[in-house]
């Protein structure tokens, strides 16, 4: 089976590429910058030039392709290119995939998209979901919450560097997941007919509130965090005020994203059925506390190695 992966240089996309190559798939990555994507070539993937903002570059990328996995997304602040890439480009991608007789299209969307159609990126993701459903391509849509990898920058690093952490005062559980595990589901969907033409809300086994993640980081780092709480109603008010001005639209959209993860999702009821459908055992899924523990262990080892090298350099200077 030959795969075309969109967004292969991203946090999730690179995991999909690596696991697909390990499993023996023929992997082709649509890229704009060959230099930036060179590590994918070193892994064994084929690189082909393609740009979602230039629809004419898409059809050649699909020649001989069995399945497409789209893990790409624009930054919500890039409004100039948002419609061009995440709507026009992805519509062109679906049409080209249909013309190329692609057998399966896997699309990574976001949780709660239908509840936040006032946010351009969410509106476009929901629109692409709908377009896939209306096409004749067998599809699988994964609605994702957050990645473990994003929590490192949001929580772990500020705790280690004694920087303030901004959180809302809402205690909403978010079922974060490791991108390596999400990649497993993406690839497994290609082998399971029962996952075709379905939309899955994909999350970890446990929901986490901000305070729990901060406490975990404090325990592992051995130091207290600086936490600044911002009421969600104030965040909404600021978002609405900025939204009145064209120059403030980017700020408004970024603030509005805080609301998305503050919609309660009870993954515990559906996780068992989801894992059963994809034939995934609980033990295969990395837990957040284990992920953070491994990160802190690696970091502390690196710091010890750096400290040892500095001591050796000082000794050499003395000698």
Curated annotation (Swiss-Prot):
The gene is ycf39. InterPro entries: HCF244-like (IPR044256), NAD(P)-bd_dom_sf (IPR036291), NmrA-like (IPR008030). Involved in assembly of photosystem II. It is found in: Plastid, Chloroplast. PANTHER family: PROTEIN HIGH CHLOROPHYLL FLUORESCENCE PHENOTYPE 244, CHLOROPLASTIC, PTHR47128. Pfam families: NmrA. The keyword Ribosomal protein does not apply. Coiled coil: none annotated. Its main location: plastid. Keywords: Chloroplast, Oxidoreductase, Photosynthesis, Photosystem II, Plastid. It is an enzyme of class 1 (oxidoreductase). GO terms for biological process: photosynthesis. Belongs to the NmrA-type oxidoreductase family. Ycf39 subfamily. This is Photosystem II assembly factor Ycf39. Its EC number is 1.-.-.-. The lineage of its organism: Eukaryota, Sar, Stramenopiles, Ochrophyta, Bacillariophyta. GO terms for cellular component: chloroplast; photosystem II. One of its GO terms (molecular function) is oxidoreductase activity. It comes from Trieres chinensis (Marine centric diatom).
């Amino acid at each position: 089976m030959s795969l075309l992966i969109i967004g292969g240089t991203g946090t999730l996309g690179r995991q999909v590429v690596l696991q697909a190559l390990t499993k023996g798939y023929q992997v082709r990555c649509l890229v704009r910058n060959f230099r930036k994507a060179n590590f994918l070539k070193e892994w064994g993937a084929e690189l082909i030039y393609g740009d979602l903002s230039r629809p004419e570059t898409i059809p050649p990328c699909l020649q001989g392709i069995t399945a497409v996995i789209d893990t790409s997304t624009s930054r919500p602040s890039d409004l100039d290119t948002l419609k061009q890439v995440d709507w026009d480009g992805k519509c062109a991608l679906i049409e080209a995939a249909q013309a190329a007789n692609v057998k399966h299209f896997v699309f990574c969307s976001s949780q709660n998209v239908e509840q936040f159609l006032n946010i351009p990126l969410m509106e476009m993701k929901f629109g692409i979901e709908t377009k896939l459903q209306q096409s004749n391509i067998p599809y699988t849509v994964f609605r994702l919450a957050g990645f473990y990898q994003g929590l490192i920058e949001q929580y772990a690093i500020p705790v280690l560097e004694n920087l303030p952490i901004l959180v809302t005062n809402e205690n909403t559980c978010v079922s974060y997941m490791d991108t390596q595990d999400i990649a497993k589901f993406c690839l497994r969907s290609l082998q399971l007919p029962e996952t075709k033409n379905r939309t899955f809300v994909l999350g970890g086994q446990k929901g986490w509130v901000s305070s729990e993640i901060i406490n975990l980081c404090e325990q592992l780092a051995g130091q207290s965090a600086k936490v600044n709480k911002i009421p969600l109603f104030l965040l909404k008010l600021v978002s609405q005020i900025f939204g009145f001005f064209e120059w403030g639209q980017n700020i408004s959209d970024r603030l509005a994203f805080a609301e998305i993860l503050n919609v309660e999702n009870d993954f515990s009821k559906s996780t068992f059925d989801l894992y059963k459908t994809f034939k995934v055992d609980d033990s295969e899924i990395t837990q957040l506390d284990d992920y953070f523990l491994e990160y802190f262990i690696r970091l502390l080892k690196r710091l010890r190695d750096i400290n040892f090298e500095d001591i050796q350099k000082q000794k050499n200077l003395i000698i």
